[in-house]
């Protein structure tokens, strides 16, 4: 299969980035090192090419009704220029994806833009079109993933860095808000969103002009490796790790994002998730920090101190900020509380660990 390439590929190649296949895209995994890039974002600023994320627009009289049917949050509360995080589930409440839904600023050609994960844009476009046709709704759904580049600038210095290059008042842009404006003279959408826990922005711009925007943001280029360690320190979900409809079927309540489920709205899984909300999930996602040496990895078993299997690791790493091995894991709800003693089986050897609330960092 031919991998999709982001518009900035040539720039990344000239910077000697290392590449990896991620969701069918050939993406930079690191430029200098994961640690250097991670620390730059935590202390100053870093920029990420996130053009592998899907971009799908919904317009027309029934745009809100359609998007509400297929996402768990309440899109009807969004004013123009606002955004919200939510889940996309099947009819049984199993997560297919997580997403940010934007209600675009006034004057935009489309009403809503939502961002599925890498490689999901085709599937989610078809899901929206199928629901539209089945219900006879009046809405236009367009997969615009190839029409935009997406660049994230994240870190304590990100607001000052971007302010110098845009005509948008970033101080007036609150978290989960989006505005239209120019970045380095390039017409763009600027959203105060991110995946790192730091102050930051995500910029959508025409792919032919992405290099101008990238070069104007003079900070450390970062790859997907640092993006992963940064999000893991915050306890953020990753599709394919913390949820997958086949390999890791989870409801939003199990995955720790039950707060995005609005049961007073008309979405496809409302009936199924009402029961989960009433009874509580049998398992929950929890943070884990190893006390012993070792790095927890996806699929490793979690046990009681006596060796009884109770769960498994979904994501794990050595935290560059904490200098400690951390992970996310599914365990029975009774164990999903901080400071419980557990074991993580690392290469056949049980390692002492304790449960942690997330985020691991205070941000």
From Swiss-Prot:
InterPro entries: GCS_T (IPR006223), GCS_T_bac (IPR022903), GCST_C (IPR013977), GCV_T_N (IPR006222), GcvT/YgfZ/DmdA (IPR028896), GcvT/YgfZ_C (IPR029043), TrmE/GcvT_dom1 (IPR027266). Signal peptide: none annotated. Pfam families: GCV_T, GCV_T_C. One of its GO terms (molecular function) is transaminase activity. It comes from the Archaea. Keywords: Aminotransferase, Transferase. One of its GO terms (biological process) is glycine decarboxylation via glycine cleavage system. One of its GO terms (cellular component) is glycine cleavage complex. This is Probable aminomethyltransferase. It comes from Haloarcula marismortui (strain ATCC 43049 / DSM 3752 / JCM 8966 / VKM B-1809) (Halobacterium marismortui).
């Amino acid at each position: 299969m031919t991998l999709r390439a982001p518009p900035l590929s040539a720039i990344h190649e000239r910077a000697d980035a290392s590449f990896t296949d991620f969701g069918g895209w050939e993406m930079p995994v690191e430029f200098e090192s994961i640690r250097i890039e991670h620390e730059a974002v935590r202390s100053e600023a870093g920029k990420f090419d996130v053009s592998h994320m899907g971009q799908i627009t919904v317009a027309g009289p029934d745009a809100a009704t359609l998007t509400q049917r297929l996402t768990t949050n309440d899109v009807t509360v969004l004013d123009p220029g606002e955004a919200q995080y939510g889940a996309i589930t099947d009819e049984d409440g199993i997560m297919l994806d997580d997403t940010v839904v934007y209600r675009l600023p006034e004057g935009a050609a489309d009403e809503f833009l939502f961002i599925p994960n890498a490689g999901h844009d085709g599937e989610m476009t078809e899901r929206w079109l199928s629901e539209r046709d089945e219900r006879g709704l009046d809405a236009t759904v367009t997969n615009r993933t190839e029409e935009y580049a997406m660049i994230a600038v994240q870190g304590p210095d990100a607001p000052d860095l971007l302010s110098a290059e845009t005509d948008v008042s970033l101080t007036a842009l609150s978290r989960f808000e989006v505005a239209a404006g120019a970045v380095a003279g390039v017409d763009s959408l600027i959203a105060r969103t991110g995946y790192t826990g730091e102050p930051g922005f995500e910029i959508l711009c025409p792919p032919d002009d992405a290099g101008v925007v990238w070069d104007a943001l003079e900070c450390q280029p970062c790859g997907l490796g640092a993006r992963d360690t940064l999000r893991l320190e915050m306890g953020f979900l990753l599709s394919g790790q913390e949820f997958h409809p086949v390999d890791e079927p989870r409801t939003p309540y199990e995955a720790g994002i039950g707060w995005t489920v609005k049961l007073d709205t008309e979405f496809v899984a409302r009936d199924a998730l009402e029961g989960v909300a009433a009874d509580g999930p049998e398992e929950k996602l929890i943070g884990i920090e190893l006390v012993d040496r070792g790095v927890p990895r996806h699929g490793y078993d979690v046990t009681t101190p006596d060796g009884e299997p109770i769960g498994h690791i979904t994501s794990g790493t050595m935290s560059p900020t904490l200098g400690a091995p951390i992970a996310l894991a599914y365990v029975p709800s009774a164990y999903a509380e901080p400071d419980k003693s557990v074991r993580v089986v690392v290469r056949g050897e049980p390692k002492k660990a304790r449960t942690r609330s997330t985020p691991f960092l205070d941000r």
